[in-house]
Amino acid sequence: MSENPDDLELESEEKQCELKSGCVYLQDSPEKTCNPILSEEAKLKAKYPSLGHKPGGSDFLMKRLQKGQKYFDSGDYNMAKAKMKSKHVVQSAAEKSLVTGDHIPTPQDLPQRKNTILTSKLAG
């Protein structure tokens, strides 16, 4: 690019003509391409130069994504909260209960019955 103001005016006029015709010069190649999508992008870039391409979106979006677990609404939050409580209850109940089904009991393994004297209430 030349730094002469007259040349700069000519270049800007050429760019405006290119935008109107729908043909755009690509930055990497010297040839002209006539793609309507590229011409629309070039028009928008010329109209709004302050809008840059941020690779991950806005700063607000990036901050929200970095915070961690998010819930869509209060219903999702309450369901996740209930799920967490039920997991804790199930785990604690499983730890306290005796494991059954490991072996088959035999009469020798069973505790002895206490001898009780059965008396009839009618006999008295």
Swiss-Prot record:
Keyword Cytoplasm found: yes
Coiled-coil region list: none
An example Gene Ontology molecular-function term: phosphatase inhibitor activity
Name of a matching Pfam family: Endosulfine
A GO-annotated cellular component: cytoplasm
GO biological process: cell division; G2/M transition of mitotic cell cycle; mitotic cell cycle
List of residues that carry Phosphoserine: 74
InterPro entries: Endosulphine
Chief location category: cytoplasm
Start-end of Polar residues biased regions: 113-124
Keywords: Cell cycle, Cell division, Cytoplasm, Mitosis, Phosphoprotein, Protein phosphatase inhibitor
Keyword Transferase set for record: no
Domain of life: Eukaryota
Compartment list: Cytoplasm
Family in the record: Belongs to the endosulfine family.
Function: Protein phosphatase inhibitor that specifically inhibits protein phosphatase 2A (PP2A) during mitosis.
Protein name as catalogued: Alpha-endosulfine
Taxonomic classification: Eukaryota, Metazoa, Chordata, Craniata, Vertebrata
